[in-house]
């Protein structure tokens, strides 16, 4: 019998094929005969959730714990030393008491408490000791089995007023749960992969939260210790919308309607959806907010690692150097085609676990070939025609929707305008990360009773961890706009990104994935080579990382890394202060730290500009004073627009050639306001 089998009685109740269970003393004896360690690990959740304020008292000739009585009343304490050598004379299973002398008894739970207080090893726990552990575990509702029980049996397990939702996903199967339990018990770094739609993001964190609820706080489950450190787990996500949507899903599936008093907390953009949190719950947080509170968590889950979100990569790099400060690191992605070898090399004790199983429903693939090569000027127009024609014979039913993946916001606007002309019987809705009421827009798309089909014309924003219940079709152009300092490139996506896009369907019904590109063009994207490197440097200094070798992804241009570090040092602001600024503000331009460092109204107004695009006259003046100059070398007029070619005159990217456009005529120089906007030089 494996250790996994010993933990099968603690599996999280998915209410599909795993249900809450209260075991009898007779069943305990049967399990004990199979393996003396069965139910011994119950000691840990009982210490944490039942015995934390327990003491022995004596009532009506029975030694018992105060928690077995009316807890609102005080009782005289009995010192443990007075009872340390007692042994049962006889056992009354029905009353759950041992007789220890002619007229004196002790409850099973009190006896377990008394004996376990003196143990150092899980192997010391006997059958007599486990009887009280079983009683306490039944009260806590921490056991489960495959014996079907009514949904209401899950009420109250986590103080939830309503039942757990019935979940069929493979991520909550017993096999998956036991494997994850084993890896967590061994304190491995765990990399979880599996098809999109099997519940990695929506369900697996509940298994990890449940493990932490039961056993979190102990590094070694073979040792019995009554002292522990209780900390929550965190599910770290790249975008606010993912935090919100997954948070609501967790809340409702765990039987809650309100965050207050639940085990679920949301943290994003300076907001916290919670006031009173359960200590062993789950925090859903944006990567940025996770990054500066790593020590607050027992287990850290980083999702969508294939995206190589800058802060996510930094979190992994920091934790690799400080792995002993947490219990476990869990990384999740639909696929690791581009990253497995590096993670194997980078993490000290990593284990890869793939959750087998297809998505819930089949996905049909259709290739619509573009007759022009991608480098042809005619490619884009042909692509638009192909999409428009395809929507005539391959479209969602009324009330359902499709997702059209495009590279950028400007492309979304252009394609929507084109497609509406020839598809007037469909609704086209643009989706991207800057839409302020994105959750409401997506909810409206999914509301019952919609009379027309709709197409969500989306940037890669919808690529990950958002389930659109009415989505039946994906139309993929296979491209993504990758920003780079003072510009950007449109690239073909990686295989990982393609897998994510395809996985937007097949979750709630059969799906169709239509792709308008040659899959031979897919290749990995090394995000760090397209990014400013300042944030990597600030975090590296804070957490004593050695650059570049301690980074998960090492930049190709190491000279730029050195130049960027020297540039930051020239600000004469301590790295501790820089870190504080970076974790509290967006800092889209590194030079903004000079304004944020002043604090007060100046910092407040700049933050308002970065978050809400509200620019005051004072903030405009402050940004101009940073002298972020661009020299205009050439000017070309196209219709009503002026197109400029210029070069950067500041920082490590000095002399970088950039292209700007505006309806206004500028001469000689302009000030950069943001990486993407500029104003008159005066």
Swiss-Prot record:
Reaction it catalyzes: ATP + H2O = ADP + phosphate + H(+)
Domain Helicase C-terminal: 386-551
Compartment(s): Virion
Pfam short name (any one): Helicase_C
Domain of life: Viruses
Keywords for this protein: ATP-binding, Helicase, Hydrolase, Nucleotide-binding, Transcription, Virion
GO molecular function: ATP binding; ATP hydrolysis activity; RNA binding; RNA helicase activity
EC number(s) recorded for this UniProt protein: 3.6.4.13
SMART domains, A to Z: DEXDc, HELICc
Gene Ontology annotations for the cellular component aspect, listed alphabetically: virion component
Domain Helicase ATP-binding: 181-354
UniProt motif DEXH box: location: 303-306
Positions of ATP binding: 194-201
Gene3D superfamilies reported in the protein's UniProt record: P-loop containing nucleotide triphosphate hydrolases
Main location (coarse class): virion
PANTHER family: ATP-DEPENDENT RNA HELICASE (PTHR18934), ATP-DEPENDENT RNA HELICASE DHX37-RELATED (PTHR18934:SF99)
Subunit structure: Monomer.
Function, as annotated: NTP-dependent helicase that catalyzes unidirectional unwinding of 3'tailed duplex RNAs and plays an important role during transcription of early mRNAs, presumably by preventing R-loop formation behind the elongating RNA polymerase. Might also play a role in the export of newly synthesized mRNA chains out of the core into the cytoplasm. Required for replication and propagation of viral particles.
The family this protein is said to belong to: Belongs to the DEAD box helicase family. DEAH subfamily.
Annotated protein name in UniProt: RNA helicase NPH-II
Organism for this UniProt entry: Fowlpox virus (strain NVSL)
